[in-house]
Amino acid sequence: MVEHPSAHERPITVDSWLVWATRMLLDLDDPAGREARGLMASLLGSAASVVTRGASPLPPELADRYVEWVERRQKREPFHLITGEVPFFGNLFSVRSGVLIPRPETELLVEQVSVRTKSCPPQSILELGGGSGAIICSLLLLYPGASGVAVDIEPDPIRCMLENRKRLSLDSRLHLLRGNWDDSIAGGLCFDLLVSNPPYIASAEIDGLMAEVVQYEPHRALDGGVDGLDCYREILGSKIDSRVMPGGLMVMEIGAGQRWAFERSGPFFELEGFDPAEVVSDWAGHGRVVIWKRKG
């Protein structure tokens, strides 16, 4: 637990609060000093303020909040749930309890879409399992002429996407639907681009994840069944891929050990009406993004 400083030993300056917080966070897996500075940067509004205000007193109301944040982080609550926002593809997104925190590796999905649609930008985008909305909002910001639909079955992601839609001035271009993936979309409606980052962690592996994930992130957004592939079977087996226009793309994130399922001998390599799947590796060499192009 956090040792609340007594009145006579309470830190005064920003720098002295950083020393205290670093000491309190030494048991974390991440470097304590970096965590302490990151929380302070969010508190003050920028990393530069941590430097320029280092010798200045931290106002009492901010000091109280900093103590609360450090205590929450010491209990392994994720950094971005404490601050309430996360950077993704050049923008800040709101995040909240009950919503999967966007990961840096997911930016590869957005990058691949950007690279492959330069000559023919999508006009309509569908995301299955919208979560925070980081993927579809980033894509809509890349393509000012596009509109999008995001589907999620849980209320917390819908609320979070509403916040980010407003935050990024996308109210008129992003439509949100709550429900099962295909059942929520009007019959016959097709899109130039379908994207998804579905749950892909094998059920037996969930409890072995970091405490921040196991204790604070929604298991429904993580658990992909016995082999982690249940949601891909659901998406591809329900013919929701027919929602992709001729010439359009279907792009999904996969787990680090799932490349085999989408390459030549895998069950998802060839889909009727699509070119064979292409697997793109992340910076660590793991298959991370799968791309299918609809023929026509």
Describe each region flagged by the PLM:
Residues 200-231:
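Mobile active-site "lid"/loop adjacent to the S-adenosyl-L-methionine
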Residues 104-208:
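Conserved SAM/SAH cofactor-binding pocket of Class I
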Residues 25, 117, 165, 239, ...:
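Conserved hydrophobic residues forming the short capping helix/wall of the S-adenosyl-L-methionine
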Residues 30, 143-145, 166-171, 243-244, ...:
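Short helix-capping segments at alpha-helix termini
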Residues 39, 76, 106, 135, ...:
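Residue-level signal for inorganic ion chemistry
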